[in-house]
Amino acid sequence: MSAPAVAPAAAFGATTRRWLDVAVASNFLAIGILLSAVPRYVKEELGGSSAAVGTATTIFFAAALLTRPLVGRAMDRIGRRPFLTWPLLVMAVLAIGMEAAHAVWAVVLVRLLQGAFGSTFYTACAVVSTDIAPPEQRASAVARLSLMIYLGFAFGPFIGEFLFDRGSQWPWLACAVLHLFAFAVSQRLPETLRERRTADQSRPSMRSLQRVVLRPGVAQLCAGLGYSCVVAFLPSYSREIGLGSSGALFFTYACSALLVRVFSGRLADRFGYVAVAVPGLFVFGLGHFLMAIARTEWLPFPAIAMTGIGFGAVFPALTALAVDRAPDEQRGQVLGVFLSFNDLGNAIAGPAVGAIADAAGFRWGYGVPAIVAAFGFVVALGLRRSPDRSLT
């Protein structure tokens, strides 16, 4: 038995969408600052290795791997709104906690907690963005959400580099302020769960959930690994090839991802999710390959733009595909499981690819994800031949 909770998607106006956009952009501007500040802090202040840098950066995603399925299930039971608000307060406290992290293990611990609470907020945002969108516009809704994310990523790393140059404490303080602002904005967001599932209502097993999202999830895992390598190793990569600050490369990546998200969601809604994801993975892998072989200071810029374009096409399309296979009352749980595949790719990238880069050379930090993206491309091709599955 279930009880009605709120009105259908049509009842949520543009104001709800705008408040969500502002909260997401503010939160991810803070996370973008950390993308450049944390690797420099571990490398320059704490003397960490490339593997340590990768671990400190991507442990964020390891925590998310465990958190998202639980959060998704809870959102289907008690609602979305609590998961849009209180995690932002905790993130503000954890940002200040970075100032007290004077060893690599302490940074890793803070990043682990940031991953748990940050992924809680993001999972809620992803579910809410599809709650308030008509079914035929789901990819566009996910693309708009990720557009707000990349507004933060476009400027955050540049700001992080700027602030870190003036003192390692300034990035953490700026992040705390941004998280608190996002918390204030989130108070304006309504509950969007249409029908609460009660404790005695049947729910799909984890095996059935994994069967539904396995192939799109594996394809997204391959993209997630490459994305994590971009954010984890770009500060050291830019210095190794003689560019100095990574801010310009981060900005190029984020701007290319922003640009493609303006229309990738609409293309996926119109022509099909797989039709956008397949070429996206190809371009994504090619960009990593070019970064791995770049011998000039100009080639990394078009190469990293290709990775941004590829990821910007892949993520909204595959996310919408997962949502499309889920009944409304189980959307949170399905999205939680799907996003965990992305988190798994993110989590293994830092320590595994970082160790390879330490042993074989920094260029393998992008050579490995190029190979993995090729595998993801093959998996995505298989989605064209597989029939749609759903939990219903």
Task: Please report, for each region that a protein language model flagged, where it lies by residue.
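Paired small-residue
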Residues: W105-L113, G287, W298-M306
